[in-house]
Design a protein with these regions (language model features):
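A generic structural signal for beta-strand entry/edge sites
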Residues: 7-11, 27, 71
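Short, intrinsically disordered, charge-balanced linker/junction segments flanking boundaries
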Residues: 168-172
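A short core secondary-structure module
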Residues: 13-57
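Glycine-rich beta->alpha junctions and the first turn(s) of the following alpha-helix
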Residues: 52-156
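A structural signal for short hydrophobic beta-strand segments in well-ordered beta-sheet cores
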Residues: 3-4
Length: 172
């Protein structure tokens, strides 16, 4: 996606794929190349609002899971954006993206910890209910060892996630 200065604003052209809430979001933050010669320092961030001329919703993806939010293509066809919708200064978009990703990765880690905790709890229930050789398989040393390793790994991941969040809060 490119953004070209035009009078008192910008004109965006291009498209973005796999955008969460691409067909329903009222406000979008869009990264666009404003100066190709500067590489990553030539990317800028813009705020776009649904209904702006030239801002179009493209194909909605038929996803296997995570259907609570739609994922779709967003298309920009000579989409005029006021200069006041530039976030920060021209060329800061790549750095802004990295800062957002840093925080987002902590959230993704937390989701992973929750999923791992749920899997561990399901395994605990199953090994308590499933009987073999006249007793619950959860009482067998080999099964107990694997469950203990899983519990330790989940707790290690939880603590690493907490530490990452704490470091982010400390500005590190």
């Amino acid at each position: 996606t490119t953004a070209v200065k035009d009078g008192d604003g910008w004109v965006l052209n291009g498209s973005k794929m796999f955008i969460t809430h691409g067909t329903s979001a009222h406000t979008l933050v869009v990264m666009a190349v404003t100066d190709k010669s500067k590489g990553p320092k030539g990317i800028s961030a813009f705020i776009l609002e649904r209904g702006m001329p030239g801002l179009l919703a493209g194909k909605k993806e038929n996803k296997l899971g995570m259907r609570a939010s739609e994922t779709a293509e967003v298309i920009f066809q000579n989409c005029r954006v006021p200069a006041s919708h530039l976030i920060g200064e021209e060329g800061q978009g790549f750095l802004q993206t990295l800062q957002v990703l840093d925080a987002g990765r902590i959230g993704i880690a937390a989701i992973g910890v929750g999923l791992a905790q749920g899997a561990y709890e399901a395994a605990e229930r199953y090994t308590a209910e499933r009987h073999q050789f006249g007793r619950a398989i959860g009482s067998l040393p080999a099964i107990r060892e694997r469950l203990n390793q899983h519990a330790s790994a989940v707790e290690a991941c939880r603590l690493l996630t907490y530490r990452a969040a704490w470091l982010k809060d400390q500005g590190r």
